[in-house]
């Protein structure tokens, strides 16, 4: 359908946004303190939170970038997902995380669409958020995290 200005119009009923916003970008690092020195000291991104997330096998730090965050991830061991990522690919972009208000609905929508999930049910993330990951094959080659913040 074309609008009055001749541009293509998409019917809003066809677009049901699953994600509210980009929550953070995750970066795998071998040395969290060294990475913090770069991101805080050089890039000027203040660290706002740091914690060990045993369930995911990482020590993580969140840095403010406007309304979003960068999440630095140091593996707690070589056999963790981030440890395996570092061994295979080295330090760098690990995932993109999108925020939702209802993670169960988002996961159901992914299942209904036939997307390959890493997590069928949410698990605990940083700051007691609820998180689940989509396999990169389901999202254009990018590891995708769905995040429902703790309330």
Sequence positions of predicted segments:
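N-terminal beta-strand motif that seeds the catalytic metal site of vicinal oxygen chelate
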Residues: 14-34, 91-100, 150-151
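Short, structured motif recognition centered on aromatic/hydrophobic residues
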Residues: 22-29, 36-39, 63, 70-73, ...
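Long, charged/polar, surface-exposed segments that mediate recognition or autoinhibition
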Residues: 89-90, 103-111
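Cationic, low-complexity basic patches in intrinsically disordered or flexible, solvent-exposed regions
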Residues: 9-12
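C-terminal "cap" of GNAT-fold acetyltransferases
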Residues: 55-69
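Vicinal oxygen chelate
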Residues: 2, 14-17, 61-62, 71, ...
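A cross-kingdom feature marking solvent-exposed beta-strand/loop segments within repeated
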Residues: 17, 21-23, 45-57, 77-94, ...
């Amino acid at each position: 359908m074309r609008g009055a200005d001749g541009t293509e119009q998409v019917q809003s009923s066809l677009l049901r946004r699953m994600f509210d916003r980009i929550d953070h970008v995750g970066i795998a690092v071998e040395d969290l303190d060294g990475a913090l020195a770069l991101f805080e000291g050089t890039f000027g991104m203040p660290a706002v939170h740091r914690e060990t997330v045993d369930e995911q096998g990482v020590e993580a730090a969140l840095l403010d970038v406007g309304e979003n965050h960068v999440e630095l991830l140091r593996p707690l061991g070589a056999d963790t997902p981030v440890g395996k990522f570092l061994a295979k690919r080295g330090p760098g972009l690990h995932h993109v995380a999108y925020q939702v208000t209802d993670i169960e609905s988002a996961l159901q929508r992914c299942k209904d669409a036939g997307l390959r999930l890493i997590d069928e049910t949410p698990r605990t993330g940083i700051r007691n958020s609820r998180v689940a990951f989509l396999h990169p094959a389901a999202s254009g080659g990018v590891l995708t995290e769905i995040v429902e913040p703790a309330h």
